[in-house]
Amino acid sequence: MLISVLKSKISYATVTGKDLFYVGSITIDSEIMKQANIIENEKVQVVNLNNGERLETYVIKGEPNSKTIALNGPAARRCEIGDQLFIISYAQVDPTRENIKPKLVDLKTGD
């Protein structure tokens, strides 16, 4: 049996762009992705602190050090530029093994 546990969390990511007519996904600055141990095409849950919306999508690598956080496709309707997001990924693990330590990145404090 496997269970889902928190693997990575980017807190207080500010939406910098949105592209309704793109095929889908969330674009994240590749340096932020590296800090959070999130890879391209990884499934993530996106939680919008401004309106309570939650959605699942996959990650596209953005330009390094651009601070890009952009929702694309239909997900663009669920945010506004300037909204604050939590971006969360999970891992499937065997509960009888040692727990993984999640990678937490807080963009508000820089941690």
Curated annotation (Swiss-Prot):
Pathway: Cofactor biosynthesis; (R)-pantothenate biosynthesis; beta-alanine from L-aspartate: step 1/1. It comes from the Bacteria. Its cofactor is pyruvate. One of its GO terms (cellular component) is cytosol. The active site is at 25 (schiff-base intermediate with substrate), 58 (proton donor). Substrate binds at residues 57, 73-75. Binds 1 pyruvoyl group covalently per subunit. CDD domains: Asp_decarbox (cd06919). It catalyses: L-aspartate + H(+) = beta-alanine + CO2. Catalyzes the pyruvoyl-dependent decarboxylation of aspartate to produce beta-alanine. Belongs to the PanD family. Heterooctamer of four alpha and four beta subunits. This is Aspartate 1-decarboxylase. It comes from Francisella tularensis subsp. holarctica (strain LVS). The lineage of its organism: Bacteria, Pseudomonadati, Pseudomonadota, Gammaproteobacteria, Thiotrichales. The gene is panD.
